[in-house]
Amino acid sequence: MASYLDFEKNIQQIDEDIINAQIKGDTEAVSILKKNLEKEISKTYKNLSDFQRLQLARHPDRPYTLDYIELILNDAHEIHGDRAFRDDPAIVCFMGYLGEKKIIVIGEQKGRGTKDKIARNFGMPHPEGYRKALRVARLAEKFQIPILFLIDTPGAYPGIGAEERGQSEAIARNLYELSDLKIPTIAIVIGEGGSGGALAIGVADRLAMMKNSVFSVISPEGCAAILWNDPAKSEAATKAMKVTADDLKSQGLIDDVIDEPTNGAHRNKEAAAVAIADYVKKSLNELENIDVRELSANRMQKILKLGAYQEA
């Protein structure tokens, strides 16, 4: 059964009316209601607020990494473990084909259903997850296979065990190593891009965001709690933080925004997957014509342009 957000109540009502009309066999009413539904969807999604886009980024029905892997990757084989501690299921790694191109996909997976969410720690990786991602990235470099990173996490796990095993070192190591990979790399924020947990697999030649995804240094709730001591002010924090794809594109922090189906990726996963696949194919066609040493140098220059600082 579909889940609806607060601002989708009118859409929910029309959907329910359509179901009732179908049960009654009233084809004329169904036809009219479907036209009304299209108008309501267009009206609702035309001018979404930043907070509404945040809600969409967290929508429980939104496609996750494994959904996209199933939809866009052929002959997919999962790669497990960091070869040091354990296999962190919050990060998944697959080798397969995108069309006729070999590709490795590394992404964060939140999980569906209570048991799966707990097993995957709600998409919050431990350090061994980031070390698994780095191991697979090095494997990709060894065999000259491009990488697609799919980012979707509230953030890196802040628990005691994660800190004891070197969470900050694992993230920093990934930033260092991924910035110098001698292969084409693409990163896409498909839902939430939570701080260092997202950056740890977000260093790439192309960084894009789905239209209804977000990317921030802290959650709006966390920001509101710190600035105003009131998590209820998260809507104001969301707007002030400029977390949306359009905001980050206008500031030059990402390269591209990938359009979603009109009513969000959660309503048409197949169309969202096609949009991602098309973007990746287009980007790879461009990147594969650039010498790998030049790719690495360009990536480093791109990183150095971020933020405002002065060298001593």
Swiss-Prot record:
One MF term in the entry's GO annotations: carboxyl- or carbamoyltransferase activity
Entries under PROSITE patterns matching the protein: COA_CT_CTER (PS50989)
Record's keyword annotation contains Ribosomal protein: no
GO terms for cellular component: acetyl-CoA carboxylase complex
Pathway(s) it belongs to: Lipid metabolism; malonyl-CoA biosynthesis; malonyl-CoA from acetyl-CoA: step 1/1
InterPro entries: Acetyl_CoA_COase_a_su (IPR001095), ClpP/crotonase-like_dom_sf (IPR029045), COA_CT_C (IPR011763)
Every CoA carboxyltransferase C-terminal domain range: 36-286
UniProt keywords, alphabetically: ATP-binding, Cytoplasm, Fatty acid biosynthesis, Fatty acid metabolism, Lipid biosynthesis, Lipid metabolism, Nucleotide-binding, Transferase
Classification via Pfam families: ACCA
Known EC number: 2.1.3.15
Localization, UniProt: Cytoplasm
Record keyword Magnesium present: no
Reaction it catalyzes: N(6)-carboxybiotinyl-L-lysyl-[protein] + acetyl-CoA = N(6)-biotinyl-L-lysyl-[protein] + malonyl-CoA
GO BP annotation list: fatty acid biosynthetic process; malonyl-CoA biosynthetic process
Quaternary structure note: Acetyl-CoA carboxylase is a heterohexamer composed of biotin carboxyl carrier protein (AccB), biotin carboxylase (AccC) and two subunits each of ACCase subunit alpha (AccA) and ACCase subunit beta (AccD).
Entry's family note: Belongs to the AccA family.
Known function: Component of the acetyl coenzyme A carboxylase (ACC) complex. First, biotin carboxylase catalyzes the carboxylation of biotin on its carrier protein (BCCP) and then the CO(2) group is transferred by the carboxyltransferase to acetyl-CoA to form malonyl-CoA.
Protein name listed in UniProt: Acetyl-coenzyme A carboxylase carboxyl transferase subunit alpha
